[in-house]
């Protein structure tokens, strides 16, 4: 009798183990599969340059990212590439991706929907128009709502296309013509992060994560580190270093030699991260408005003057006007976003302010708290442009 019970118990254990392995296999996410990358849907995708690494098993997922039903709602996965930690992003919710596919098929009058053919139809239709291919107009007809398309210009579109094509040629990427345009269109419409990381690359000094490549509907970028929310109660020296870099980021995006101003429309504390060497980077670049300053100067009707952000906030959000950003040669928006949004007490993403508890001796010698408040709530128009360089100089002297 006891022997029979042992056999039954052992059988049950074996069955449970088999079921467990099957369930683990079912719930397991395989990054090398077409189901994960959707590379078969290109050119309705972000690119294909990193596909060999995916298909050869050089990219693996870490932790709960391995499990199908515990994935991030935004489709963000932690992984490894050549023993380096990386972040894999599909850059949208599943529902957003499905809605974009439907939009593209509807615009191409394609039913049943085959989104890769829809993209080819839309691109070829515009390529066939002699001497009048205006990619900007194509984007407009598709009712894009991404921030990067809010202030469109032919120079910006050409710049983005040239940057992506140049990087494809460096890796001997095939069909950089209509196929590349399809990928550019798809990224601009759904989420332009991959495009921005390539066009404004870290190698050229921009404060963004390194873009490592893409396969289908997945991009891969470097894992930077913990977000700045982790450092909110760190020692003063470390916090002032981070604040200094945040203002440098705001300054570079606003005032640079590219002819483009990049305005951050989402500056919450989880959108900035700190590398192991202490470097601060903007790690979520989906919400960036790009203004072509050169193009504006050619327009006789544009407002050839600076724009002042008034700082009218709603709870936990940044209140601004796309028209104001698009139609002025320069705005203090980035300074307003960092100072009012993160640094001062009662900022909307840091109630006590990232620069809380400034040492008394520092305040006495530098008047830093007053200057940061002036950046957040200026007493005169455009004073942020005058006060930010002073703040940066003081912070640099404290490091």
Cite the ranges covered by each PLM segment.
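Conserved beta-strand elements of beta-rich interaction domains across eukaryotes
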Residues: 83-86, 92-96, 216-218, 225-226, ...
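Catalytic activation segment of kinase domains across protein kinase-like and atypical kinase folds
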Residues: 258-329
């Amino acid at each position: 009798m006891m022997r029979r019970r042992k056999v039954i118990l052992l059988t049950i254990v074996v069955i449970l183990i088999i079921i467990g392995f099957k369930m683990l296999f079912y719930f397991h996410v395989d990054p090398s599969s077409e189901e994960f990358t959707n590379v078969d849907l290109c050119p309705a995708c972000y690119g294909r340059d990193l596909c060999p690494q995916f298909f050869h098993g050089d990219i693996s997922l870490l932790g709960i990212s391995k499990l199908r039903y515990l994935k991030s709602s935004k489709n963000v996965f932690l992984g490894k590439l050549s023993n380096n930690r990386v972040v894999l992003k599909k850059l949208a919710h599943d529902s957003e991706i499905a809605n974009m596919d439907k939009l593209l098929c509807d615009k191409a009058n394609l039913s049943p929907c085959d989104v890769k053919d829809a993209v080819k139809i839309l691109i070829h239709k515009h390529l066939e128009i002699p001497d009048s291919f205006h990619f900007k107009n194509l984007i407009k007809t598709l009712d894009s709502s991404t921030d990067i398309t809010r202030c469109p210009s032919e120079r910006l579109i050409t710049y983005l296309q040239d940057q992506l094509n140049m990087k494809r040629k460096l890796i001997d990427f095939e069909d950089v013509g209509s196929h590349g345009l399809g990928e550019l269109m798809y990224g601009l419409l759904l989420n332009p992060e991959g495009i921005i990381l390539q066009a404004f690359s870290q190698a050229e000094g921009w404060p963004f994560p390194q873009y490592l490549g893409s396969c289908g509907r997945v991009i891969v970028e470097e894992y930077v580190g913990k977000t700045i929310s982790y450092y909110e109660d760190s020692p003063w020296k470390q916090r002032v270093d981070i604040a200094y870099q945040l203002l440098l980021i705001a300054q570079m995006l606003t005032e640079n030699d590219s002819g483009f101003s990049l305005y951050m429309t989402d500056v919450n504390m989880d959108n900035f991260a700190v590398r192991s060497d202490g470097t601060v980077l903007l790690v979520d670049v989906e919400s960036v408005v790009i203004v072509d300053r050169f193009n504006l100067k050619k327009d006789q009707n544009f407002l050839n003057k600076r724009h002042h952000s008034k700082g009218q906030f709603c709870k936990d959000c940044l209140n601004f006007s796309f028209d104001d950003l698009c139609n002025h040669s320069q705005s203090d928006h980035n300074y307003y976003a960092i100072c009012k949004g993160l640094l001062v007490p009662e900022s909307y993403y840091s109630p006590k302010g990232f620069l809380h508890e400034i040492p008394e001796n520092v305040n006495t010698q530098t008047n830093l708290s007053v200057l940061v408040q002036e950046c957040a709530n200026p007493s005169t128009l455009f004073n942020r442009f005058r006060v930010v360089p002073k703040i940066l100089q003081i912070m640099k002297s404290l490091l």
